[in-house]
């Protein structure tokens, strides 16, 4: 009953109706408190009445603070029994009024699906910007959310950009409701996947955009996986309905089949391709058209075009049947052969979407300024507000026991730094406030470093513009200046020892050496490296111990090229780069026993350590495992710890190529010590020597990264594309042939894909495109392995000569 009341309150959104809905569960209702207070007042004098009402407000505030404190205790002591419904039920009515109208959303999709174009329309229709500008900066301005010159030149989003806007929508009774939307536009290219990861980590919902022609593409599948990782409810928006070959029903089917999430269309297009005019809302059975120079005027009518009336009835029935599969209330109505009301359908869509059982599918064309406003209405109707989303933390005072975060302003502050960015005013740290209030001038504590930090300035970001604010409440997103931290750090006000889990960070797959062309640029080069590694966890920098070269690592060629270009533009540092290097790995395939003794004596105390045991492949490639099975104390604990350090040092740089070792296990079950000559260093060195010998005797292998590659090109170039893949010994997993284009899905070794982009363009007259993402490590071909090992041994011999 409580959930129904909340949903009814959400959809009707008038304070009188919310009061009546909540009075079922609790009396007196929140909204009636001031009315009750006024009716009880014994005074007729105005000033005395005001004083009495003010006193009642203070009493009510204390009561809500007491309730909030009890909820906080339950969140710590027994989080599993604290439901989101109970959290909402005990919200201060003023807080409920604010939070119920907040939406934290991201826009994510495959590259070139129209994310930034759609975001530009959202900002225009909400009044956040006064004019629409297109991607690639064709009008010398460029889209608002692409603030970097590189983004506007290349027509791609490189960094996620945050903004906020207010959307006024009409409810079913025709009354206006204002919603506050915090919006993050994310990149589509796989090389910048960390930007999507950290955006989704702090958001409550998302709009997943699909191309009406291509449907579900490779990066769509990656985005879906990321949304599932963080339990993000999503609305699907089939964009580019005005393109030749647009087929929204194929996209809906692919969401169901490829992404394996129940989906149904909430709209039917009125016309397609050049004749796309608008959509029919299947919930309310109304035709919706965009009018005006930029589609800013919405015209609704009950007159549905005659040629699609039957299709609309059919698709509405499909929607109800799909909802009956995922929602009990609609299932009952469906089994009783009754027709659900509009309110029941909307409530069911909302329940199923928030519980991750369903995704509603909208349709439109952002570039043609059509059907973006109904998508905004759907964000407000079907995606959750912050109080409806479960967020967990770990309590360090209770052995990192899980605790639930409660989105009340009155509780102790907890926030997560999810993105760092350098600005002209210094380091900018983006923070999602999960609990409590963040105020200008307050002190916060970094849970990782235990450092106390004062917040000098709080701003709301609008791409690269900012608006200063004095404070920000639970459920909101902001940015602060002057905070020294790392991406993923948790902040509290010091009253709670909470820490939040950070976002998933994939491992880099490609490296190259880099140095400034001119020695005088070294200070700026170092500054750039320091800044980029702080901002981007997937961009790694290290110095090779032998060559003393600076090595940068990242997610792909484009990823590293962008940083090299940014150094030139932002720091005026011209760089020389070496050939890209693949991040190979090493492993062993057979068990090998070892009995190794390190013995050095040169007068005085020497070195002595004996280690006995075996090495073998670990259960999975994802781990290296050290284990001791010593009995009788033949090796003391401190020496065993030194053995483990020796093992970890050995896995960091393998014997074959000097790359990391994966999937290897070492067990030490015996050994010997000397009363004078044994030391921790001796046992560490002995373990490393034993590791090298055993590893080389255990049929070692070089592992190379395989990339999940997706190539799309016009049908007439299919033979050329397949030929390119065959030359690279790619394994073709699937091929989809459409009316005009085909798509090939293949596994390719990263080593073979250098320079593929230019060859693909040449073979397809510039019409082909491809994307890659890391799939898994696989044994390298024997010939390649021999070449790599021989090259490494030759380099080592030259260095030691």
Curated annotation (Swiss-Prot):
Belongs to the TRAFAC class translation factor GTPase superfamily. Classic translation factor GTPase family. EF-G/EF-2 subfamily. Mitochondrial GTPase that catalyzes the GTP-dependent ribosomal translocation step during translation elongation. During this step, the ribosome changes from the pre-translocational (PRE) to the post-translocational (POST) state as the newly formed A-site-bound peptidyl-tRNA and P-site-bound deacylated tRNA move to the P and E sites, respectively. Catalyzes the coordinated movement of the two tRNA molecules, the mRNA and conformational changes in the ribosome. Residues 100-387 form the tr-type G domain. It is found in: Mitochondrion. It comes from Pyrenophora tritici-repentis (strain Pt-1C-BFP). Residues 1-65 form a transit peptide. GO terms for biological process: mitochondrial translational elongation. CDD domains: EF-G, EFG_III, EFG_mtEFG1_IV, mtEFG1_C, mtEFG1_II_like. GO terms for molecular function: GTP binding; GTPase activity; translation elongation factor activity. This is Elongation factor G, mitochondrial. Pathway: Protein biosynthesis; polypeptide chain elongation. The keyword Ubl conjugation does not apply.
């Amino acid at each position: 009953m409580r959930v129904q009341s909340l949903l009814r309150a959400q959809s009707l959104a008038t304070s009188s109706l919310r009061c009546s809905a909540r009075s079922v569960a609790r009396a007196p209702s929140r909204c009636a408190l001031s009315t009750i207070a006024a009716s009880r007042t014994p005074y007729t004098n105005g000033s005395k009445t005001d004083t009495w009402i003010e006193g009642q407000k203070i009493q009510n505030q204390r009561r809500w603070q007491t309730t909030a404190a009890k909820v906080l205790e339950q969140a710590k002591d027994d989080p599993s029994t604290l439901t989101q419904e109970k959290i909402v039920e005990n919200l201060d009515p003023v807080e409920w009024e604010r939070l119920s109208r907040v939406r934290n959303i991201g826009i994510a999709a495959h590259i070139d699906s129209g994310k930034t174009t759609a975001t530009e329309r959202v900002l225009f229709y909400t009044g956040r910007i006064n004019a629409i500008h297109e991607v690639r900066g064709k009008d010398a301005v460029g889209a608002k959310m692409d603030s970097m010159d590189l983004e506007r030149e290349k027509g791609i989003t490189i960094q996620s950009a945050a903004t906020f806007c207010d959307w006024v929508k009409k409810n079913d009774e025709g009354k206006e409701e204002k919603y506050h939307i915090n919006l993050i536009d994310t990149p589509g290219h796989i090389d910048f996947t960390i930007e999507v990861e950290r955006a989704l980590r702090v958001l409550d919902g998302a709009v997943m955009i699909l191309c009406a022609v291509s449907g579900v593409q490779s990066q769509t599948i990656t985005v879906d996986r990321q949304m599932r990782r963080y339990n993000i409810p999503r609305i699907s928006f089939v964009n580019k309905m005005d393109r030749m070959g647009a087929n929204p029903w194929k996209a809906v089917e692919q969401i169901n089949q490829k992404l394996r999430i129940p989906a149904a269309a909430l709209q039917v297009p009125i016309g397609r391709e050049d004749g796309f005019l608008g959509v029919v809302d299947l919930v309310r059975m109304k035709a919706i058209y965009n009018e005006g120079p930029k589609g800013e005027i919405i015209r609704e009518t009950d007159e549905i075009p005659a040629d699609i009336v039957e299709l609309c009835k059919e698709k509405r029935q499909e929607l109800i049947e799909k909802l009956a599969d995922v929602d009990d209330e609609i299932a009952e109505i469906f089994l009783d052969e009754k027709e659900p009301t509009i309110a029941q359908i909307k409530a069911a869509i909302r329940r199923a979407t928030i519980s991750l059982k369903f995704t509603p599918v909208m349709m439109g064309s952002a570039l043609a300024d059509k059907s973006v406003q109904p998508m905004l209405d759907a964000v407000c109707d079907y995606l959750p507000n912050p109080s409806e989303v479960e967020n967990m933390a770990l309590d360090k005072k209770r052995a990192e026991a899980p605790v639930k975060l409660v989105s009340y302003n009155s509780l102790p502050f907890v926030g997560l730094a999810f993105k760092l960015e350098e600005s002209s005013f210094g380091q900018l740290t983006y923070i999602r406030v999960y609990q409590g209030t963040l105020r200008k001038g307050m002190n916060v504590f970094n849970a990782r470093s235990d450092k106390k930090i004062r917040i000098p300035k709080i701003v709301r970001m609008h791409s690269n513009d900012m608006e200063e604010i004095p404070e920000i409440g639970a459920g909101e997103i902001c940015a602060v200046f002057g905070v020294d931290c790392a991406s993923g750090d948790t902040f509290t006000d010091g009253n709670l020892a909470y820490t939040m889990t950070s976002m998933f960070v994939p491992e880099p797959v490609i490296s190259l050496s880099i140095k400034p062309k001119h020695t005088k640029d070294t200070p700026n080069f170092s500054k750039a490296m320091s800044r980029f590694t702080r901002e981007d966890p997937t961009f790694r920098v290290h110095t090779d111990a032998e060559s003393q070269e600076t090595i940068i690592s990242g997610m792909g060629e484009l990823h590293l090229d962008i940083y090299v270009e940014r150094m030139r533009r932002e720091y005026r540092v011209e760089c020389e780069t070496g050939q890209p290097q693949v991040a190979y790995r090493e492993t062993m395939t057979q068990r090998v026993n070892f009995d190794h003794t390190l013995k050095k004596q040169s007068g005085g105390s020497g070195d002595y350590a004996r280690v006995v045991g075996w090495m073998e492949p670990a259960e999975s490639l994802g781990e290296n495992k050290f284990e001791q099975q010593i009995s009788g104390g033949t090796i003391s604990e401190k020496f065993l710890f030194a053995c483990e350090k020796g093992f970890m040092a050995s896995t960091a740089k393998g014997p074959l190529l000097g790359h990391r070792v994966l999937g290897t296990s070492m067990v030490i079950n015996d050994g010997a010590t000397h009363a004078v000559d044994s030391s921790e260093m001796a046992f560490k060195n002995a373990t490393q020597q034993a590791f090298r010998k055993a590893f080389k005797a255990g049929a070692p292998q070089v592992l190379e990264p395989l990339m999940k590659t997706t190539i799309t090109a016009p049908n007439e170039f299919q033979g050329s594309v397949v030929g390119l893949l065959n030359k690279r010994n790619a394994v073709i997993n699937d091929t989809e042939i459409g009316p005009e284009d085909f798509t090939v899905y293949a596994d390719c070794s990263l080593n073979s894909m250098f320079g593929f982009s230019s060859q693909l363009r040449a073979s397809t007259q510039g019409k082909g495109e491809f994307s890659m993402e890391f799939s898994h490590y696989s044994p390298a071909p024997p010939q390649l392995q021999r070449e790599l090992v021989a090259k490494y041994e030759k380099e080592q011999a030259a260095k030691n000569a």
